[in-house]
Amino acid sequence: MIGIEEKDMIINRIPAKTWNHLHMNQSRVGEVVINRTGELNASVNDVSLIDDGKLNNGELNNIIGGCGQEITEAARKSQTEPVYYITDKKNAGFVRLDFNYGRNNADINVVGIETKENASIDVYMDFNGDKDGEGFAAVQTRLYAAKDSVIRLIQIQRVGSETTFINDIGGYCEDGARIELVPVSYTHLRAHETRSNL
C-alpha cells in the first residue's frame, strides 16, 4: 500500500485582502493518510489521453492551484497516477470524469486538461461518494488554455457531508483564451430525485 501521512496540512493560503472580504484565509487538515488513487471512470470524445503527462512541455505541472503547494506535495508523495487529456479540435465534445469515493477511503486524484490554439472542450467532473462517508478525498485539476481556446469545467459535488473533500483547481490562459468554471453543489440538488445524465 502506498501512503503518505500529512499532519496539519494547511490549504488555501489566501492573502489579507481576501481575509477582509471572506473572513477566512486558510484551513488546516489534520493527520491525513492518503493511501490510494481514487476510483475514476472516464468517458472521452475526440480527446487524446497523454500517458507521460508532458503537456505543453511540462508547463501544466507548474500551475499552482488555490489550495497551495502542500496539496501538490501530498499528491506527489502519494505517487498517485495522474491522468492528462489534450485536444486541438474546436468543439471537441467532452471529457466526463466520474470519481467514486467509498465510505472511509483516503483518496487523491490528479487531472490535467490542455487545449491547443483555437480548440474548445467541455469537462464534466462528478464527485460522488457514500452519503454516510467519513473519509478524505482530494482532486487536483490543472488547466492550460492555449491562445483563443476555451475550457469549460463543470463540477458536480455529491460526496457525503462528513467527508473531508479538497477540490484544488489551477489554470493558465494564453492571449484570448478563457476557462469557465461551473460548480454545482449537492445541496442545490434534490438528491433522492436527481440522476447524473450529463
Residue ranges and their predicted role:
Residues M1-T37:
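Short, Gly/Pro- and small/polar-rich lid/capping loops
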Residues I10, T18, E59-I63, A75:
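Generic structural signal of hydrophobic/aromatic residues within well-ordered alpha-helices
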Residues T18-H21, Q26, A42, D46, ...:
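N-terminal cationic leader/targeting segments used for protein routing and processing
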Residues L40, V44-E59:
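N-terminal non-catalytic cap/leader segment that marks the start of a structured domain
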Residues D51, N62-R190, R195-S196:
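Conserved beta-strand/loop scaffold segments within soluble protein domains that form the structured core
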